[in-house]
């Protein structure tokens, strides 16, 4: 399996910059003051550079919501019990979750991926079964996952990206479901970005002050216990991550290898993206960070990564909800690029120089 991961990493190339001048020339020729559509122009340019399609069609969209349970939930770091994870998966499978509503709204197909839920599901439409294990181990007392388990989860995510590419999807989105998963995500940020735990630990599902202080202590203990395992991004992911986070890492790596842009959801999904970027820095060329989460610390993470989220709506749900909303902006940007008239073709006078 290690060889498969090495092959995957080697397949990822930076976005082809040779089209940049032609893209910019077309954007500047559109019937508007140059640069006046701001981020929409940047989004169109990034999408075209990533895919290499100078005349991009509107992409077929797919969101994968990865689900997993966490041993660290036993430490009491969440306001909700762990059994909520499978309950929410069932809610998604029945079409009643926020991500169901928003994915339908934006015309994205939704797949719910069981990569580590502490429950066995019967086969169902839109459910992808690739369980590595029924929940991670408690990272406060040892590694959350073994190296083999981490590899399995990464490669499962990558395989889903490959399947999406083969099925003609041109824009992918990440989502997640896992009670207590802000705890491993925060630990990953603290170690991989050298950020202080206390400054980036948030309330997750709505914990009170006492539980927040306890959560900070649990994360600090987990980092100390696993210090020797955190020499590499992969080792850090195994020690402090979770199955759904590892699968998101693999999903992003697989998409980048196939030159498919990915819209990254919020606080949890960004931790999977961070690991992917630490493994192959050029992965960032294929990523749209959908929104600035209301979860404490996400702003510091975005700043440390040098990226600008597309939206700021005080979202803190996860599931892929922010990714779904941001997909509409990608569509809008490509429509602007494809459908606006040009000065050279519409007989509109350009700016007077001087």
UniProtKB/Swiss-Prot annotation:
Pathway: Nucleoside biosynthesis; alpha-ribazole biosynthesis; alpha-ribazole from 5,6-dimethylbenzimidazole: step 1/2
Catalyses which reaction(s): 5,6-dimethylbenzimidazole + nicotinate beta-D-ribonucleotide = alpha-ribazole 5'-phosphate + nicotinate + H(+)
Pfam families in the record: DBI_PRT (PF02277)
Keywords: Cobalamin biosynthesis, Glycosyltransferase, Transferase
Top EC group: transferase
An annotated GO BP: cobalamin biosynthetic process
Active-site residue numbers: 319
Molecular function via GO: nicotinate-nucleotide-dimethylbenzimidazole phosphoribosyltransferase activity
CDD domains (UniProt xref): DMB-PRT_CobT (cd02439)
SUPFAM superfamilies: Nicotinate mononucleotide:5,6-dimethylbenzimidazole phosphoribosyltransferase (CobT)
Family the UniProt entry places it in: Belongs to the CobT family.
Protein purpose: Catalyzes the synthesis of alpha-ribazole-5'-phosphate from nicotinate mononucleotide (NAMN) and 5,6-dimethylbenzimidazole (DMB).
HAMAP family in the cross-refs: CobT
The protein's name in its UniProt record: Nicotinate-nucleotide--dimethylbenzimidazole phosphoribosyltransferase
Naturally occurring in which organism (per UniProt): Chlorobium chlorochromatii (strain CaD3)
């Amino acid at each position: 399996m290690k060889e498969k991961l090495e092959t995957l990493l080697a397949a990822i190339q930076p976005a082809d910059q040779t089209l940049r001048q032609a893209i910019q020339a077309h954007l500047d020729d559109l019937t508007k003051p140059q640069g006046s559509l701001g981020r929409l122009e940047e989004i169109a340019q990034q999408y075209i550079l990533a895919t290499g399609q100078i005349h991009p069609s509107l992409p077929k969209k797919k969101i994968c919501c990865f689900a997993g349970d966490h041993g660290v939930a036993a430490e009491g770091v969440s306001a909700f019990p762990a059994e909520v994870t499978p309950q929410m998966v069932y809610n998604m499978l029945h079409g009643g979750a926020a991500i169901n509503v928003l994915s339908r709204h934006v015309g994205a197909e939704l797949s719910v991926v069981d990569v580590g839920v502490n429950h066995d599901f019967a086969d169902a439409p839109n459910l992808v079964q690739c369980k590595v294990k029924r929940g991670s181990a408690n990272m406060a007392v040892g590694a959350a996952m073994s190296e083999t388990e981490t590899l399995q989860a990464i490669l499962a995510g990558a395989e889903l990206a490959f399947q999406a590419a083969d099925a003609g999807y041109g824009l992918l989105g990440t989502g997640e479901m896992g009670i207590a998963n802000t705890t491993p995500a925060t630990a990953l940020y603290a170690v991989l970005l050298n950020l202080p735990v206390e400054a980036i630990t948030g309330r997750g599902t709505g914990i009170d002050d006492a539980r927040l202080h306890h959560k900070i202590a649990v994360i600090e203990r987990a980092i100390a216990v696993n210090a020797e395992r955190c020499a590499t991004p992969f080792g850090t992911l195994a020690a402090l991550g979770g199955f759904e986070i590892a699968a998101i890492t693999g999903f992003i790596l697989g998409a980048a290898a196939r030159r498919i842009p990915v819209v990254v959801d919020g606080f949890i999904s960004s931790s999977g993206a961070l690991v992917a970027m630490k493994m192959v820095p050029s992965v960032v060329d294929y990523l749209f960070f959908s929104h600035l989460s209301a979860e404490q610390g996400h702003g510091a993470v975005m700043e440390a990564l040098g990226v600008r989220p597309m939206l700021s709506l005080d979202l803190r749900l996860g599931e892929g909800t922010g990714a779904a909303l941001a997909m509409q902006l990608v569509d809008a940007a490509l429509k602007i690029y494809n459908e606006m008239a040009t000065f050279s073709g519409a007989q509109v006078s350009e700016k007077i120089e001087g």
